[in-house]
């Protein structure tokens, strides 16, 4: 609501060079409220279900599953549900914001020549598939909502894997938030120029807030997050095997 009130409503007229596609929260990088939302995405993604494995161990349900030899089915179903919950929690605020922008701001295609499209060049790397951004802007938004869904789900998966090592629900919730902060800080030190290209959350934006976007980097980061989750869950399952 603050984003709509402060960063959308005052600039809703077409004379300001904005349309839905350039001012919604996923595509506009000049807002502190959007920055705060993306900062909290790892925490929000973990809250719905990432602590389920820990809760099931504490209640004894996980031990019951083990005695029934249903461990693989348990983890398969848990990961899918946790991934879906984390992804939905990530894109739900973005979808609501997009809908509100459609109610207030003109539905006009971005114009590379006439409008200030906030550093989205046709041949640059501020976003993936820039030609789609100009020719089919709504499709471009839907594509990045899908990417944001995947990023949120994968981060929730990492938190789920960490719940096999942690004994406190709150620590499970904040674990990925802390790890993501430390990771971004480390990458920022190692790669002083273009560090944001290697941040997973960069690809939850339609337009990169800093640096550039690379499709190969995004795919690699997603594979790494999935790999970390699988290794962590296997390690945790081994650690909590019944004697």
Indicate residue ranges for each PLM-predicted region.
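Junction motif at the cytosolic side of a transmembrane helix
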Residues: 161, 165, 223-243
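Helix-loop-helix units of permease transmembrane domains in multi-pass membrane transporters
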Residues: 52-85
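Short loop-to-helix capping motifs
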Residues: 1, 68-71, 167-169
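Residue-level recognition of pore/gate-forming positions within transmembrane alpha-helices
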Residues: 1, 82, 177-181, 226
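Transmembrane helix-loop junctions in multipass membrane proteins, especially transporters and channels
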Residues: 8-12, 98-110, 168, 188-196, ...
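Hydrophobic core positions of alpha-helical segments in small-molecule transporters
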Residues: 76-77, 172-176, 221
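Central hydrophobic cores of alpha-helical transmembrane segments
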Residues: 169-183, 201
């Amino acid at each position: 609501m603050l984003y709509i009130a402060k960063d959308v409503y005052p600039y809703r007229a077409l004379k300001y060079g904005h349309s839905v596609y350039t001012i919604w929260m996923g595509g506009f990088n000049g807002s502190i409220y959007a920055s705060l939302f993306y900062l909290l995405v790892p925490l929000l993604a973990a809250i719905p279900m990432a602590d389920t494995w820990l809760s099931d161990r504490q209640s004894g349900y996980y031990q019951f599953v083990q005695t029934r030899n249903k461990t693989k089915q348990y983890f398969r179903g848990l990961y899918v549900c946790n991934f879906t919950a984390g992804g939905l929690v990530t894109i739900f605020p973005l979808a609501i914001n997009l809908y509100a922008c459609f109610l207030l701001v003109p539905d006009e295609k971005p114009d590379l020549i006439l409008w200030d499209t906030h550093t989205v060049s046709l041949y640059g790397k501020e976003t993936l598939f820039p030609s789609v951004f100009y020719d089919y802007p709504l499709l471009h938004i839907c594509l990045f909502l899908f990417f944001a869904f995947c990023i949120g789900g994968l981060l929730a998966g990492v938190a789920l894997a960490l719940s096999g090592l942690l004994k406190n629900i709150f620590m499970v919730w904040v674990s990925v938030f802390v790890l993501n902060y430390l990771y971004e800080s480390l990458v920022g030190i190692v790669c002083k120029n273009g560090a944001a290209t290697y941040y997973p959350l960069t690809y939850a934006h339609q337009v990169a807030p800093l640096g550039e976007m690379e499709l190969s980097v995004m795919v690699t980061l997603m594979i790494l997050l999935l790999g970390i989750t699988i290794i962590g869950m296997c390690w945790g399952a081994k650690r909590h095997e019944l004697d």
